[in-house]
Amino acid sequence: MNKILLQCDNLCKRYQEGTVQTDVLHDISFSIGEGEMMAIVGSSGSGKSTLLHLLGGLDTPTSGDVIFSGQPMSKLSSAAKAELRNQKLGFIYQFHHLLPDFTALENVAMPLLIGKKKPAEIDARAREMLHAVGLEHRATHRPSELSGGERQRVAIARALVNNPRLVLADEPTGNLDARNADSIFELLGELNRLQGTAFLVVTHDLQLAKRMSRQLEMRDGRLTAELSLMGAE
């Protein structure tokens, strides 16, 4: 069994607006190992995106904790969480969130710039990742000049440019057609094999989820089961 990379212990999330209290997540506990590929499957509104925000340190749980590489996030300062996100975590979203005025190469390089790497290292690593996602020939193109599938590949290259230990992906193929969605998941699997990066993908698509090594189901803010999707149609 792979060494545990990230662990959730009884995560709960509650929002309060005036006298109205909304419980979004209920006692979420699970772990993901080094280099593992896991899917969390659930319909819209089931709490999947909220969970990813907690795992990435973008939001704070009402109770419970997230432990990354043996370190409780509750013990980290805001600056330490930001450094963790820059150095150890990658994020992929349904919408690519590329900067429109920057080229593909510049978008991929952004986490390295934030991390204050040396210029030569930034350029070499960003080009290496564009090559890894098959877009080195599009390095000087802006997002408006790329197809939807190409934009998402650039977003994936950006997420992986710092060689993170874990990538959190929120419906990464939600805006793509079936052919491009299939291509993106093939790419994630290849990058997992080549770099040993762990992936946690939330999705409502069973066909895509079954490509991952483990699948958990979320309903109404609760993890309800570990799924077996080998025969999913």
Curated annotation (Swiss-Prot):
<keyword id="KW-1278">Translocase</keyword>
<dbReference type="InterPro" id="IPR003593">
    <property type="entry name" value="AAA+_ATPase"/>
</dbReference>
<keyword id="KW-0472">Membrane</keyword>
<dbReference type="GO" id="GO:0089705">
    <property type="term" value="P:protein localization to outer membrane"/>
</dbReference>
<dbReference type="GO" id="GO:0005524">
    <property type="term" value="F:ATP binding"/>
</dbReference>
<comment type="function">
    <text>Part of the ABC transporter complex LolCDE involved in the translocation of mature outer membrane-directed lipoproteins, from the inner membrane to the periplasmic chaperone, LolA. Responsible for the formation of the LolA-lipoprotein complex in an ATP-dependent manner.</text>
</comment>
<keyword id="KW-0067">ATP-binding</keyword>
<dbReference type="InterPro" id="IPR015854">
    <property type="entry name" value="ABC_transpr_LolD-like"/>
</dbReference>
<dbReference type="InterPro" id="IPR011924">
    <property type="entry name" value="LolD_lipo_ATP-bd"/>
</dbReference>
<dbReference type="InterPro" id="IPR027417">
    <property type="entry name" value="P-loop_NTPase"/>
</dbReference>
<dbReference type="GO" id="GO:0022857">
    <property type="term" value="F:transmembrane transporter activity"/>
</dbReference>
<feature type="domain" description="ABC transporter">
    <location>
        <begin position="6"/>
        <end position="233"/>
    </location>
</feature>
<dbReference type="GO" id="GO:0016887">
    <property type="term" value="F:ATP hydrolysis activity"/>
</dbReference>
<dbReference type="InterPro" id="IPR003439">
    <property type="entry name" value="ABC_transporter-like_ATP-bd"/>
</dbReference>
<keyword id="KW-0813">Transport</keyword>
<comment type="similarity">
    <text>Belongs to the ABC transporter superfamily. Lipoprotein translocase (TC 3.A.1.125) family.</text>
</comment>
<keyword id="KW-0997">Cell inner membrane</keyword>
<dbReference type="GO" id="GO:0044874">
    <property type="term" value="P:lipoprotein localization to outer membrane"/>
</dbReference>
<protein>
    <recommendedName>
        <fullName>Lipoprotein-releasing system ATP-binding protein LolD</fullName>
        <ecNumber>7.6.2.-</ecNumber>
    </recommendedName>
</protein>
<dbReference type="Pfam" id="PF00005">
    <property type="entry name" value="ABC_tran"/>
</dbReference>
<comment type="subunit">
    <text>The complex is composed of two ATP-binding proteins (LolD) and two transmembrane proteins (LolC and LolE).</text>
</comment>
<dbReference type="GO" id="GO:0005886">
    <property type="term" value="C:plasma membrane"/>
</dbReference>
<keyword id="KW-0547">Nucleotide-binding</keyword>
<dbReference type="InterPro" id="IPR017871">
    <property type="entry name" value="ABC_transporter-like_CS"/>
</dbReference>
<feature type="binding site">
    <location>
        <begin position="42"/>
        <end position="49"/>
    </location>
    <ligand>
        <name>ATP</name>
    </ligand>
</feature>
<keyword id="KW-1003">Cell membrane</keyword>
<dbReference type="InterPro" id="IPR017911">
    <property type="entry name" value="MacB-like_ATP-bd"/>
</dbReference>
